[in-house]
Amino acid sequence: MLRSEKPVAVEDIVNIYKESPSVIITHYHGLTVSQVSSLREALKSKEVGFKVVKNTLAKIAAKHTGLDSITDLFAGPSAIVYSKEPVEMARLVVNFANSNDNLKIIGGIVDNHILDTYAIKELAKLPSLHELRGKIVGLLQAPATKVVGVLQATSSSIARVIHAHAIKH
C-alpha cells in the first residue's frame, strides 16, 4: 500500500467504526479465496460488511474513534465484520467459524462494550431484533384474542340461555 493511500484507508476504517455499532475482529489465516468469497456473499446478503485490514491502520482508526481498548485484538491476518444488527452478524460469523476452522473470532465491540470470543458466541444464540419484535407483537395480541374469546363465549352462552328459556315457555 502506498503511503498516500494509508490516510484514505484509515478514514475508511474510521467510518466503519463510527457507522457500525457492532464490529467483530477475526483472523482469516488459511482461508482460501473461494471461502472468503462465500463468506462475503453470505454476509452481504444480510447487509453485513467484511473488510480485510492492515493491523496498524485498524489500530490508528480505533484510536481516532476512542476505541483504544480494541487495539490489542489486532495481531495476525485481521479482518473486521461490521453491521448495525449485532445478533445477526454474530450468528453469521459464528456459524461460518464453526464450519471452518480457519476463521478465528478474536473479539469485538457492540455499542461500545468490548466482547470476547465467548460473549460473541453467546450473542449469536440470542434472537434477532426482528424476532423479538415478532414475539412482543404476539404477546400483545394474545390477551386481546383471549378477551374476544371470552366475550364471544359469554354472548353465545347468554343467547343459549335465552333460547332455552324461550323454548320452555
UniProtKB/Swiss-Prot annotation:
<keyword id="KW-0689">Ribosomal protein</keyword>
<dbReference type="GO" id="GO:0015934">
    <property type="term" value="C:large ribosomal subunit"/>
</dbReference>
<comment type="similarity">
    <text>Belongs to the universal ribosomal protein uL10 family.</text>
</comment>
<keyword id="KW-0694">RNA-binding</keyword>
<keyword id="KW-0699">rRNA-binding</keyword>
<comment type="subunit">
    <text>Part of the ribosomal stalk of the 50S ribosomal subunit. The N-terminus interacts with L11 and the large rRNA to form the base of the stalk. The C-terminus forms an elongated spine to which L12 dimers bind in a sequential fashion forming a multimeric L10(L12)X complex.</text>
</comment>
<dbReference type="Pfam" id="PF00466">
    <property type="entry name" value="Ribosomal_L10"/>
</dbReference>
<comment type="function">
    <text>Forms part of the ribosomal stalk, playing a central role in the interaction of the ribosome with GTP-bound translation factors.</text>
</comment>
<protein>
    <recommendedName>
        <fullName>Large ribosomal subunit protein uL10</fullName>
    </recommendedName>
</protein>
<dbReference type="InterPro" id="IPR043141">
    <property type="entry name" value="Ribosomal_uL10-like_sf"/>
</dbReference>
<dbReference type="InterPro" id="IPR047865">
    <property type="entry name" value="Ribosomal_uL10_bac_type"/>
</dbReference>
<dbReference type="GO" id="GO:0070180">
    <property type="term" value="F:large ribosomal subunit rRNA binding"/>
</dbReference>
<dbReference type="GO" id="GO:0006412">
    <property type="term" value="P:translation"/>
</dbReference>
<keyword id="KW-0687">Ribonucleoprotein</keyword>
<dbReference type="GO" id="GO:0003735">
    <property type="term" value="F:structural constituent of ribosome"/>
</dbReference>
<dbReference type="InterPro" id="IPR002363">
    <property type="entry name" value="Ribosomal_uL10_CS_bac"/>
</dbReference>
<dbReference type="InterPro" id="IPR001790">
    <property type="entry name" value="Ribosomal_uL10"/>
</dbReference>
<dbReference type="InterPro" id="IPR022973">
    <property type="entry name" value="Ribosomal_uL10_bac"/>
</dbReference>
